[in-house]
């Protein structure tokens, strides 16, 4: 949220954010998007790009015009394409593993899933 707020302040535009409800992103808190309003999507980290794509889809479904994605850390390895420009401050190449190939899984070590999408 902080990244988006500061981006909006620098661009002198409205800052809003989407909430997750029943596995879908929605606008709450009185936020609205005007038809044709240009929207820049901000995120802290992108690995597969699912949340960013959901946000772009939400903006379009509400009549907005997503024009760019700004992220702090790009972990995608260049494997995401949102159809609009993507800008990042850092590009990191970190290994990711399928569960069958994960060395920690093979050693029987428990895994945790950090982040805002984790369910407790």
Language model segments and positions:
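PRPP-dependent phosphoribosyltransferase catalytic core
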Residues: 56-120
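A contiguous pocket-lining binding segment that forms or flanks enzyme active sites
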Residues: 32-71
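Surface-exposed beta-strand edges and their flanking turn/coil or helix-capping segments
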Residues: 30, 41, 99-103
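Short, structured secondary-structure boundary patches
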Residues: 14, 36-42, 88-92, 109-110
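Short, glycine/charge-rich flexible loops or terminal/linker lids adjacent to PRPP-binding catalytic cores
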Residues: 1-40, 47-50
């Amino acid at each position: 949220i902080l990244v988006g707020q500061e981006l909006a302040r620098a661009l002198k535009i409205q800052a809003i954010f989407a909430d997750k409800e029943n596995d879908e992103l929605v606008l709450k808190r009185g936020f609205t998007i005007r038809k044709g309003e240009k929207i820049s999507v901000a995120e802290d980290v992108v690995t597969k790009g699912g949340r960013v794509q959901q946000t772009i889809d939400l903006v379009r479904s509400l009549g907005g015009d997503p024009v760019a994605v700004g992220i702090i850390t790009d972990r995608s390895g260049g494997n995401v394409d949102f159809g609009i420009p993507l800008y990042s401050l850092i590009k990191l190449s970190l290994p990711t593993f399928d569960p069958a190939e994960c060395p920690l899984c093979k050693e029987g070590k428990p895994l945790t899933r950090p982040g805002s999408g984790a369910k407790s």
